[in-house]
Amino acid sequence: MQDIGKCARSASRAMARASSEQKNQALLHIAKVVRQKSEEIQQVNQVDVERAKVNGQDAAFIDRLTMTPKTIETMALGLEQIVLLDDPIGKIGTLKKQASGIELGQMRVPLGVIGIIYESRPNVTIDAAALCLKSGNAVILRGGSEAIDSNTLLAQIIQEGLAAAGLPKDAVQVVTITDRAAVGEMITMTQYIDVIVPRGGKSLIARLMAEARVPMIKHLDGICHTYIDADADIAMAIKVCDNAKTQRYAPCNAMETLLVNRDIAPKVLPSLCKVYQDKGVELRVDALTRQTLEQNGFQNLVDATEADWQTEYLAPILSIKTVADIDEAMNHIEHYGSKHTDAIITNNKAQADRFLREVDSASVMVNASTRFADGFEYGLGAEIGISNDKLHARGPVGLDGLTSLKYVVLGHGEIRT
């Protein structure tokens, strides 16, 4: 691991001075070779898949691990989309002339060496490497042992693209050591790695949070809420809350808890919950919500427990609570939320403004689905992940989140007096 770190640190200097043309050339070459080697990628990936089946992995795991022609084409298209993104490196914001005569600005520069730790999705090898490459960083990729053959081949393709553009192949390295001790060492290599970006389940993130010495860009949970205010448009509330929960269940920006103002609950809950039950969503409800729904003929309701309010289901399960007002809703979010994404449905501007100002989450929304908390939807292009921390990056992390700002001073011989 130390040798990998040394090589990455050396390569990061070359990447920092690489031109946009070089970086884009590398990305386009990688996209071309990914398409050319689609069958080989699938064959190698099948080795990983068969091994996972022998090891008893479940169907969802196998699905994440499997690379299909569609998956591979999506990777190639993603590379081409990153080429189209503006290169942030070297850009200087507005220069401000100071009283002394000097001009002061800030230049965007790479972070240096980024470590990506991820689990069973081999497409992350391409996606993460591409974003790090475009932002002028070197990257060390440590994927799950279950995808080692796929990741090794994809790394070879990436390094071929780097060489074709005259960039150091060590700018992208895949850790082929499958021992978990490699992760333990990687997250303490402060002399070589500037930031760790973990992509995986809660147990992985929790372990890294406890053991890492290298700073991380991460989120632990996506416990996202939507609050339907007393002044909400009912049709809008049904449409938005349906989408927030059922458009896809697994993403971290899917709604997990619905909060409903008691004054509008009898008007909106019956219609909305019929939509949910028709789609097979299990409803875990508090006493007031149960009363409202049972009065309208609903059955098969589950009593919500304390654990439900703090659970990221990633499944067709929804917790619902009826609240007295916006204050109770925001207090619930503050107590149980994960500071990821929370939304209010209301036509009351004062209530909307309060929610935006007082809810302490990375993304706060008015009259929109929490599913919009995504790098592509925010116009960032691809994203390396989502952060619910407050320092360095917050929310969806795109190219700018893989950079920092340094001060630049332009003078004309000025001296300090």
From Swiss-Prot:
Matching Gene3D superfamilies: Aldehyde Dehydrogenase, Chain A, domain 1, Aldehyde Dehydrogenase, Chain A, domain 2
Listed PROSITE patterns: PROA
CDD domains: ALDH_F18-19_ProA-GPR
Catalyzed chemical reaction(s): L-glutamate 5-semialdehyde + phosphate + NADP(+) = L-glutamyl 5-phosphate + NADPH + H(+)
Subcellular location(s) of the protein: Cytoplasm
Its EC number(s): 1.2.1.41
InterPro entries noted in UniProt: Ald_DH/histidinol_DH, Ald_DH_C, Ald_DH_N, Aldehyde_DH_dom, G-glutamylP_reductase_CS, Glu-5-SA_DH, GPR_dom
Gene Ontology annotations for the cellular component aspect, listed alphabetically: cytoplasm
Homology family: Belongs to the gamma-glutamyl phosphate reductase family.
Stated name of the protein: Gamma-glutamyl phosphate reductase
Lineage: Bacteria, Pseudomonadati, Pseudomonadota, Betaproteobacteria, Burkholderiales
Gene for this chain: proA
